[in-house]
Regions:
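Class II aminoacyl-tRNA synthetase catalytic cores and aaRS-like
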Residues: 1-598
Length: 598
């Protein structure tokens, strides 16, 4: 039966007790992580968020009643112990911070009993994720998950402190706002007071932080909750958290400077990792040409090589056909993989097809320097030698080629180089490689909508020298946009914003938005632009992704206390769920039943 803790005050967390406290009385509280009965002695590993502390129950010290209670303890019971800190009676446990001491218990109170948990509360368990998420309150007790959540809190706290010291003001922006076009789907909230009308949960604080710049708050920050109704991936959630900021009277270099110093500060304080400054910069075009990705992983090489000029006159129709259609032929060199079995090469071909390739061509260079190739019969010996030389091919290498439109070739080889690097063990999670990617295209063509859409968002300022092409050649316009990339993952992005009303109007028209639609959706921003707008720029980090990489995890679900799963549901609470008819009536909502075909 559970006992009261009245009259008790915890004096220490478990790992706050040390050898310096030997001989002192302490009161500790937590969960029973493990219990060992040695007959006349009982040992308990007591766990709280700080770690583990060993408790010794000796009948000669605690008395028979207390010893009997200790005998009844089971894993996950919540207990309070008063006792004296003593030197460990047995061998020192070098794996524990408190491994040289223990508490000789004088009193024991059982504050709460526990049923047998559905999985062990230990590190590196093999329990399926859906079970762990269903019992998330238990999962969060495990040290490896707990350390992630604690790290997340530390990153947020340090970020606030750093930016406050840089003159930023933390200002909250609305959670119930207006649905606007562009971007992902909004989560909509029906209004009871205004039947038939809806709020939208913010995809970002973008418009409000720009209006704060119009209002004279020249440095804004917020740890902001954001919502996007889109399909989930390993690094996506329907609700997520941004480190959001905006600055007035700045240019690209000013924003990058603040954020480089922020990143260096966070990595030093949290991980004791030195970030070399300045961080490397690369234009979007260079990143795509060299790595096939706008978020390249720089922990390894395997750069793309454009071999179009070498193969343009060969007899291989796959290559020449791609070039005749305005595409390119590019390849990567998987060093030391020339002896890869055909079965594995076929698996790589299937992988490439998943990214849009029609196939992959390859050259395997044998140790004697001879070649095995899927297209050798279409090439002269001189052409093959020139191709291998251009690829820096050596004995034992595997050369892989894709031929198609540039967008497909980049997509295929960009993904393939990461897949190969993973197979080759080149992705060291302790090696942090940062990169700024700059000068993104202002627009990208949407085949689905048959129009240009904003690559970032419609408030991004074009490069000054490209402004004249907004109407005549939008596909060639570059943006004053920048992403910060870490180990192949975009952890943040931002841009210089449009602050002239006429340029913003031209941007809307380039996106196919009429003046009427633009005013309907963004009139509040355009009105603010009428009364003096400072040049401004900003950036937002995905806090979840940043902490995921810092914690060396593979999924952001491991660094979020209560995450959703891939169908955007919560296994802990069973949200989303049906609501009763009265609630729907109050919101003027009627649910139509799906019609079934007879």
């Amino acid at each position: 039966m559970a006992e009261s803790m009245v009259g008790l005050k915890r004096s220490h967390r478990c790992t706050e007790v040390s050898s310096a406290d030997i001989g002192k009385k302490v009161t500790v509280m937590g969960w029973v992580a493990k219990r060992r009965n040695l007959g006349s002695l009982i040992f308990v590993d007591l766990r709280d968020r700080s770690g583990i502390l060993q408790i010794l129950f000796d009948e000669n010290i605690i008395g028979k009643e207390g010893f009997d209670k200790a005998y009844a303890l089971r894993n996950e019971f919540v207990i309070a112990v008063e006792g004296e800190v003593i030197k460990r009676s047995g061998a020192v446990n070098e794996n524990l911070k408190t491994g040289d001491i223990e508490i000789a218990a004088k009193t024991l109170r059982i504050l709460s009993e526990s049923e047998t948990p559905p999985f062990p509360i230990e590190e590196n368990i093999q329990t399926k994720e859906d079970i762990r998420l269903k019992y998330r309150c238990l999962d969060l007790r495990r040290h490896d998950i707990q350390s992630n959540i604690i790290m997340r809190s530390k990153v947020a706290t340090l970020t606030r402190a750093f930016l406050a010291n840089e003159g930023f003001l933390e200002i909250e922006t609305p959670m119930l706002t207006k649905s606007t076009p562009e971007g992902a789907r909004d989560y909509l909230v029906p209004s009871r007071i205004h039947p038939g009308k809806f709020y939208a949960l913010p995809q970002s604080p973008q418009l409000f932080k720009q209006m704060l710049m119009c209002s004279g708050y020249d440095r804004y920050m917020q740890i902001a909750r954001c919502f996007r109704d889109e399909d989930l991936r390993a690094d996506r959630q329907p609700e997520f958290t941004q480190i959001d900021m905006e600055l007035s009277f700045v240019d690209v270099d000013d924003v990058i400077d603040v954020n480089e110093r922020l990143l260096a500060y966070l990595f030093k304080e949290v991980l004791d990792v030195d970030v070399k400054l300045p961080i490397q910069r690369m234009t979007w075009q260079e990143a795509m040409d060299r790595f096939g990705s706008d978020k390249p992983d720089l922990r390894f090489g395997m750069e793309l090589q454009n071999v179009s000029d070498i193969v343009k006159d060969c007899g291989f129709g796959v290559f020449t056909g791609a070039l005749e259609n305005g595409g390119s032929v590019r390849g990567i060199n998987a060093k030391g993989q020339g002896s890869m079995p055909r079965k594995k090469i076929d698996a790589l071909v299937d992988f490439a097809k998943g990214y849009g390739a029609k196939g992959l061509a390859y050259i395997a260079i044998h140790e004697d320097g001879s070649y095995k190739s899927s297209f050798a019969k279409f090439m002269t010996e001189d052409q093959m030698n020139a191709l291998v030389k251009a690829m820096d091919g050596e004995a034992g290498d595997l050369l892989l080629f894709a031929a198609d439109r540039n967008k497909i070739v980049w997509n295929v080889l960009g993904a393939l180089r990461v897949e190969l690097a993973d197979q080759m063990g080149l992705l060291d999670k302790s090696d942090y490689k940062f990169l700024w990617v700059t000068e993104f295209p202002q627009f990208e063509w949407s085949d689905e909508e048959e129009r240009y859409v904003a690559m970032h968002h419609p408030f991004t300022m074009p490069m000054d020298e490209d402004l004249d092409m907004l109407e005549t050649n939008p596909g060639a316009v570059r943006a004053k946009a920048y992403d910060i990339v870490l180990n192949g993952t975009e952890i943040g992005g931002g841009s210089v914003r449009i602050h002239q009303a006429d340029v913003q109007s031209r941007m809307f028209k380039a996106l196919g938005l009429t003046d009427e639609v633009a005013n309907e959706k963004f009139g509040f921003l355009l009105d603010a632009f009428k009364y003096g707008v400072p040049p401004h720029a900003g950036l937002a980090y995905g806090l979840d992704r940043l902490v995921m990489l810092m914690a060396k995890r593979d999924s952001i679900r491991d660094v979020i206390a209560f995450p959703k799963v891939k169908d955007a549901s919560c296994l802990l609470t069973n949200a989303p769920d049906v609501v009763d008819a009265k609630q729907l009536d109050e919101l003027s909502i009627k649910i139509e039943e799906e019609k079934t075909e007879e």
